[in-house]
Amino acid sequence: LDYNLHVIVNLHYDGGWLANFPTDKETCMTKYTRIWEQLSDAFQDYGDYLVFESQNEELGWDSLWNRWSSSTDGKAESYALVNEINQKFVDIVRASGGNNAKRHLLISGYGTDIDLTCDPLFQMPQDPANHCAVSVHYYTPSDFAILEEDASWGKVRSTWGTDADIQQLNHYMDMLQTAFVDKGVPVIIGEYGCPKKNKDADSVWLFLSSVCEAAYSRKMCPVMWDVTGLHYDRSACQMYDSVLQENFQKILQTYNDTKIGDINQDGSVTIADVVLLQQHLLQEKSLTAAQAKAADTWSDGVLNGFDVTALRQTVLTFT
């Protein structure tokens, strides 16, 4: 946050206790409630660049409904429990005070699976602030996007990019657009990616870039999962791969017509932009609608001192 980054905080596996929800709901819900009460209290005064997410991939239980079978036994019950937990999450955060009353919240889909989350049984929670987005993950096809070596459930695939692959990607992105984006619900693809071991380099570039563009073109936010540092050097704050970096930059230029912070629209973010924003807040200069959009570093529709601070930090960090 000090570096003007967006941060998503969620519960992520945590030893697997969430798997016990179907058999020990009271204990699990109590633990879930206590965790989010404490997190909400600790971060209640943080700005909107901090997002809370209800869960990672753990909402959905094969012990209630076996998603891999053709049976629907237990399906409604399993979805109802997912919906109940997500509603509990929203209620806890909204009741905690501070900026949590309007904080952007990310609602975990059913197993963060696109097919299952687009099912009518999945329901977005009621939110008085109307600041909820849905979270899904994309690792399809799994033999390319997950496997590095042959496994019991499939053989590793080294290439990606056939017409069928592109059609499959567009099919899933269209599903999300129809189920959520077109209804005013933002979508964050909170994880997508693929390994590089035993993969064709051109296919890796194409897959990562294609998913990114498919999401951006439908006004969804893709987040590349790279905790192992395959593509991004966190110590140097730069991409390892210049080809992938160039691909991403082209996508941003194509689908993002506003460069946040570039208030004077000269193509870069400098101290001149900070001065211009300060002059606007002091009512010495007026901003056009496009300039005001670029100045809204917090993306909250309001220009104030928080935007000046964030913009100044950006200039100091990257110059």
Regions found by a protein language model. Name each.
Residues L1-G47:
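Substrate-binding cleft of extracellular glycoside hydrolase catalytic domains
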Residues L5-G16, D48-S54, I188-E191, M224-W225:
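Short beta-strand segments at enzyme active-site cores
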Residues Y13-T30, G60-G74, S203, D233-S242:
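Surface-exposed, active-site-proximal loop segments in enzymatic domains
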Residues G15-A19, I114-D115, P195-K199:
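Short, solvent-exposed loop/turn segments at secondary-structure junctions
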Residues T27, K31-R34, Q38, E84, ...:
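Extracytoplasmic/secreted proteins, especially bacterial periplasmic and envelope-associated proteins
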Residues M29-T162, D174-C194, S217-M220:
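Active-site region of glycoside hydrolase catalytic domains
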Residues D163-L252:
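Substrate-binding cleft of secreted/luminal carbohydrate-active enzymes
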Residues D257-T319:
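Cellulosome-associated attachment modules in secreted, modular CAZymes
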